Protein backbone atom coordinates (compact mmCIF):
# COMPACT_ATOMS: atom_id res chain seq x y z
CA UNK A 1 0.00 0.00 0.00
CA UNK A 2 1.22 3.47 -0.88
CA UNK A 3 -0.33 6.42 0.86
CA UNK A 4 0.18 10.14 1.13
CA UNK A 5 -0.14 12.03 4.39
CA UNK A 6 -1.14 15.52 3.39
CA UNK A 7 -1.42 18.66 5.47
CA UNK A 8 0.33 21.88 6.40
CA UNK A 9 3.57 22.03 8.36
CA UNK A 10 2.95 20.95 11.99
CA UNK A 11 -0.29 19.12 11.15
CA UNK A 12 1.04 15.90 12.68
CA UNK A 13 2.04 14.06 9.51
CA UNK A 14 5.39 12.94 10.89
CA UNK A 15 3.87 11.72 14.15
CA UNK A 16 1.25 9.64 12.34
CA UNK A 17 3.72 8.34 9.75
CA UNK A 18 6.04 7.04 12.48
CA UNK A 19 3.11 5.19 14.06
CA UNK A 20 2.18 3.61 10.72
CA UNK A 21 5.80 2.56 10.15
CA UNK A 22 5.83 0.80 13.53
CA UNK A 23 2.42 -0.84 13.11
CA UNK A 24 2.41 -1.72 9.42
CA UNK A 25 6.10 -2.02 8.55
CA UNK A 26 5.84 0.56 5.78
CA UNK A 27 8.66 2.92 4.87
CA UNK A 28 8.21 6.62 5.62
CA UNK A 29 9.45 8.77 2.77
CA UNK A 30 9.63 12.15 4.43
CA UNK A 31 10.98 14.82 2.14
CA UNK A 32 11.71 16.94 5.20
CA UNK A 33 13.86 14.20 6.73
CA UNK A 34 15.60 13.57 3.40
CA UNK A 35 16.33 17.26 2.94
CA UNK A 36 17.64 17.61 6.51
CA UNK A 37 19.90 14.58 5.88
CA UNK A 38 21.22 16.25 2.72
CA UNK A 39 21.98 19.39 4.74
CA UNK A 40 23.70 17.38 7.48
CA UNK A 41 25.89 15.68 4.87
CA UNK A 42 27.46 19.05 4.06
CA UNK A 43 27.33 18.21 0.35
CA UNK A 44 26.90 20.82 -2.36
CA UNK A 45 23.28 19.71 -2.70
CA UNK A 46 22.87 20.00 1.07
CA UNK A 47 24.20 23.55 1.09
CA UNK A 48 21.83 24.52 -1.72
CA UNK A 49 18.90 22.93 0.11
CA UNK A 50 19.85 24.72 3.36
CA UNK A 51 19.74 28.12 1.67
CA UNK A 52 16.30 27.42 0.19
CA UNK A 53 14.82 26.09 3.44
CA UNK A 54 16.32 28.86 5.57
CA UNK A 55 14.37 31.32 3.40
CA UNK A 56 11.17 29.29 3.90
CA UNK A 57 10.94 28.45 0.20
CA UNK A 58 10.16 25.09 -1.40
CA UNK A 59 12.95 22.98 -2.90
CA UNK A 60 12.72 22.39 -6.67
CA UNK A 61 10.72 19.45 -8.00
CA UNK A 62 13.81 17.95 -9.63
CA UNK A 63 15.69 17.65 -6.32
CA UNK A 64 12.75 16.27 -4.37
CA UNK A 65 11.75 13.78 -7.09
CA UNK A 66 15.31 12.47 -7.33
CA UNK A 67 15.41 11.94 -3.55
CA UNK A 68 12.07 10.08 -3.61
CA UNK A 69 12.97 7.91 -6.60
CA UNK A 70 16.17 6.85 -4.88
CA UNK A 71 14.16 5.49 -1.91
CA UNK A 72 11.36 3.68 -3.80
CA UNK A 73 13.12 0.27 -3.92
CA UNK A 74 13.31 0.30 -0.11
CA UNK A 75 9.57 1.02 0.10
CA UNK A 76 8.77 -1.75 -2.39
CA UNK A 77 10.71 -4.27 -0.29
CA UNK A 78 8.77 -3.21 2.81
CA UNK A 79 5.39 -3.52 1.15
CA UNK A 80 4.53 0.13 0.89
CA UNK A 81 5.40 3.75 1.37
CA UNK A 82 4.06 6.63 3.38
CA UNK A 83 4.74 9.85 1.50
CA UNK A 84 5.07 12.63 4.06
CA UNK A 85 5.52 16.13 2.66
CA UNK A 86 5.39 14.95 -0.95
CA UNK A 87 3.88 15.70 -3.37
CA UNK A 88 3.33 19.41 -2.82
CA UNK A 89 2.40 20.41 -6.35
CA UNK A 90 0.34 18.86 -9.15
CA UNK A 91 3.49 18.35 -11.30
CA UNK A 92 5.08 16.46 -8.38
CA UNK A 93 1.91 14.35 -8.02
CA UNK A 94 1.98 13.55 -11.73
CA UNK A 95 5.68 12.65 -11.52
CA UNK A 96 4.97 10.39 -8.53
CA UNK A 97 2.10 8.69 -10.37
CA UNK A 98 4.41 8.08 -13.35
CA UNK A 99 7.25 6.77 -11.14
CA UNK A 100 4.92 4.34 -9.40
CA UNK A 101 3.21 3.27 -12.65
CA UNK A 102 6.61 2.32 -14.10
CA UNK A 103 6.91 -0.05 -11.14
CA UNK A 104 3.36 -1.40 -11.46
CA UNK A 105 2.21 0.52 -8.40
CA UNK A 106 -0.05 3.44 -7.53
CA UNK A 107 -1.11 5.72 -4.71
CA UNK A 108 -3.84 3.89 -2.81
CA UNK A 109 -4.96 6.63 -0.42
CA UNK A 110 -4.41 10.30 0.33
CA UNK A 111 -5.13 11.36 3.90
CA UNK A 112 -5.40 15.09 4.56
CA UNK A 113 -4.95 16.24 8.14
CA UNK A 114 -6.91 19.47 8.56
CA UNK A 115 -5.64 21.82 11.28
CA UNK A 116 -6.65 25.44 11.92
CA UNK A 117 -3.94 28.08 11.45
CA UNK A 118 -3.87 29.27 15.11
CA UNK A 119 -3.28 25.67 16.23
CA UNK A 120 -0.50 25.28 13.65
CA UNK A 121 1.21 28.41 14.95
CA UNK A 122 0.92 27.14 18.53
CA UNK A 123 2.35 23.73 17.56
CA UNK A 124 5.22 25.21 15.54
CA UNK A 125 6.13 27.65 18.33
CA UNK A 126 6.30 24.76 20.79
CA UNK A 127 8.37 22.64 18.40
CA UNK A 128 10.74 25.56 17.73
CA UNK A 129 11.21 26.09 21.47
CA UNK A 130 11.86 22.37 22.05
CA UNK A 131 13.87 21.43 18.94
CA UNK A 132 15.15 24.74 17.56
CA UNK A 133 14.73 23.76 13.90
CA UNK A 134 15.62 26.85 11.80
CA UNK A 135 12.66 26.30 9.46
CA UNK A 136 10.31 26.38 12.48
CA UNK A 137 11.11 29.93 13.57
CA UNK A 138 7.89 31.99 13.47
CA UNK A 139 8.91 34.27 10.58
CA UNK A 140 10.03 31.39 8.35
CA UNK A 141 6.96 29.36 9.34
CA UNK A 142 4.61 32.06 8.04
CA UNK A 143 6.41 31.84 4.67
CA UNK A 144 6.25 28.03 4.72
CA UNK A 145 2.53 28.06 5.49
CA UNK A 146 1.82 30.59 2.73
CA UNK A 147 3.83 28.47 0.25
CA UNK A 148 1.95 25.36 1.35
CA UNK A 149 -1.44 27.06 0.94
CA UNK A 150 -0.60 28.56 -2.46
CA UNK A 151 1.19 25.63 -4.05
CA UNK A 152 -0.59 22.61 -2.63
CA UNK A 153 -4.23 23.74 -2.83
CA UNK A 154 -4.58 22.33 -6.40
CA UNK A 155 -3.68 18.87 -5.09
CA UNK A 156 -7.02 18.58 -3.29
CA UNK A 157 -9.13 18.43 -6.46
CA UNK A 158 -6.43 16.33 -8.20
CA UNK A 159 -6.80 13.54 -5.65
CA UNK A 160 -10.50 14.13 -4.95
CA UNK A 161 -11.26 13.52 -8.65
CA UNK A 162 -9.39 10.21 -8.41
CA UNK A 163 -11.50 9.21 -5.40
CA UNK A 164 -8.41 8.85 -3.21
CA UNK A 165 -8.75 11.84 -0.85
CA UNK A 166 -9.99 11.42 2.72
CA UNK A 167 -10.07 14.51 4.94
CA UNK A 168 -9.48 13.98 8.65
CA UNK A 169 -9.70 16.26 11.68
CA UNK A 170 -6.07 16.89 12.62
CA UNK A 171 -7.13 19.02 15.60
CA UNK A 172 -8.05 15.93 17.62
CA UNK A 173 -5.69 14.08 19.94
CA UNK A 174 -2.88 12.00 18.45
CA UNK A 175 -4.79 8.84 19.41
CA UNK A 176 -8.07 10.02 17.86
CA UNK A 177 -6.32 11.01 14.62
CA UNK A 178 -4.62 7.60 14.59
CA UNK A 179 -8.01 5.89 14.91
CA UNK A 180 -9.40 7.98 12.04
CA UNK A 181 -6.42 7.03 9.87
CA UNK A 182 -6.81 3.33 10.67
CA UNK A 183 -10.52 3.50 9.83
CA UNK A 184 -9.81 5.25 6.51
CA UNK A 185 -7.12 2.72 5.58
CA UNK A 186 -9.31 -0.27 6.46
CA UNK A 187 -11.64 0.77 3.64
CA UNK A 188 -8.74 0.85 1.15
CA UNK A 189 -6.95 -2.34 2.22
From Swiss-Prot:
Q: Which GO terms fall under biological process for this protein?
A: AMP salvage
Query: GO CC annotations?
Result: cytoplasm
Highest taxon of the source? Bacteria
- Where, per UniProt, does this protein localize? Cytoplasm
Q: Where does AMP bind?
A: 31, 36, 57-59, 85-88, 92, 133, 144
What SUPFAM superfamilies has UniProt attached to this entry? P-loop containing nucleoside triphosphate hydrolases
Q: Which Pfam families match?
A: ADK
Its UniProt domain note says: Consists of three domains, a large central CORE domain and two small peripheral domains, NMPbind and LID, which undergo movements during catalysis. The LID domain closes over the site of phosphoryl transfer upon ATP binding. Assembling and dissambling the active center during each catalytic cycle provides an effective means to prevent ATP hydrolysis.
Q: What is this protein called?
A: Adenylate kinase
Species this chain originates from: Caulobacter sp. (strain K31)
